[in-house]
């Protein structure tokens, strides 16, 4: 027994040509199609243009206009207009096959079929034939009880040579699978309600296809065996328009195309297949399927529901994928996968790459509440899936989920399996609360690649917004809003290669997780050479930048930047920076060089920072820690000092005069060599070992560094660096403290002006000697008091004098 699943009411699809708004709608569709085709820019433009030229050489502006002209040619070729009832057709349960055959004859005829249900064993239409009923559900043509399982309800009569100019309108076609106690398609491309095979110029309008053994409507080639390296549409159908049709209960797909081209499918409904073409639980029965070898196909304002896939653009492993397919204004309601693009057998890295899966657009399409379906248990709900296809454009896509439906953490949109060059603009997603992620970009060896997502809105949907897979480095995410409740992460990527700009998020625990780093605001992440606020700059490398400059400034190398500069300033090599300079240049393939605030200089040495006017005037050497200056070094402080360690390991107070005990210092007494004074005002200080342990690098017998030549890991250049002491323990580096932070080390002022502790004997102009580290009056010497800055008091036990040491 055949079970009908929510068959649509035929009255919903009644002929609407009598309504004035219908004409307006057709004009709107025509304008959209015309603009779309005229302004399309694909490699197949020439072929599409040729398709708009009639057999008489007349150029039409639109392929549909050529179809219209061919329709009028069909009317002009008709020499008879008959009613099938005049040939004995009666809707009373008898076999009317012969009556239809006689009425149709050899073609060039318009056959009218009155209201009623007519049983036939298949109708074959020759060229130049129009068959017209009274409307869907009013005129019904149904297969007779004795009809073989392989028969169609209607097809063309010459599969070998092909047919042309056939028009079918205004009827329901019932394949009657319950005949003979239940029949199914015996295999092959038989058993459909209506098939055009090798037909040029065909029209199918206002037709209802019911319970087909295979497909409701099939636009095809006589055979399905054309390889990708052949002219695979040579024997297919072309210039076909399917309009305002309904299919349901199909054994496989509702409306499908194979090895055919220039097909229009508009204003149609296809849903609720029976799936009997497959084993139970694995029925890939789809609403509209643009299958093997189809190309130049337009789907306009159609509706699908209850299918495994609402619209599938695909091919099987051995056959060419459908190309140049345009889906406009389609609504998928409760199909499992609303829109699915794939080339089977070309998904894994071990599979051959598809050479034919190209050029699909989806414009203003909607996926509403995709759901699981027992027809195919293993297929999980998605709004959009793209696999293996390249050059795909999705614009104005809307995905609406049921917040209470369990999507079992599956993604809403999945780009996967070696798909590439995909643009998604203006996508809106909401309501998939129990999905796993709204947009999933698969990584790994079978990754998708070169993805652009822009002007998108995700609202109260999955816990994750956009997930980027590993090894995926070419993703642009621009201008989006992501708002949800109790979300986990808005954008997730295992690397920082995605370009992210202008994205806002709300309601996620983490706005972004990029290479393990989490953000509470979605960051701006830009890659590629950037030219910003410059009238004439060049960022040559993908990791270089020129910013706020003029005069053909150029950043050539990796991680190079030229900022606030002019006069043709340029960088080369790796990790180079020029800032606030004119006509400054970093040259060669060395690494880590910087020019600041300079005019007309050239820097070549690695690991240096330099500046100057007309020539380098100062240079800092990061390898050796040296600084070189052509001019003076100024300080508000006075004197020169060096670090010395106290012999006791204890702090010696500022202003104390010290002497040497071996290599360490103690407070000086009368007769001691006065080394210097503990100072806090030395302008120049040496011996600090500020950054690393003083013994980290090997030295020669005179204390100079021992050098070695090593290869820079990044640039490959040979550089000369101090040789590390084999006894150096890097594990202790974290606990190392500069001498400035340790009590036992002191800055000892050796020459210049310093503050010295003095006793009550000292006056301005006196010489000093030392007693227990405190200055006392001497008759001569090299220490002379310039002025008393703090008079001696017995309470403190000292005064303070500014003293010059020579």
Swiss-Prot record:
**Segments of this protein annotated with the region Disordered:** 1-23
What cystine linkages occur within this chain? none
Q: Which domain of life is it from?
A: Bacteria
Q: Where is the composition biased (Polar residues)?
A: 12-21
SUPFAM superfamilies for the chain: Pectin lyase-like
Start and end residues of the PbH1 repeats are 199-221, 237-259, 260-292, 294-315, 419-441, 448-470
> Does the keyword Repeat belong to this entry?
yes
> Which keywords, in A-to-Z order, does the entry hold?
Repeat
Pfam families per record: Peptidase_G2
Protein name, per record: Putative phage-related protein YobO
Its source organism is Bacillus subtilis (strain 168)
> Which gene codes for it?
yobO
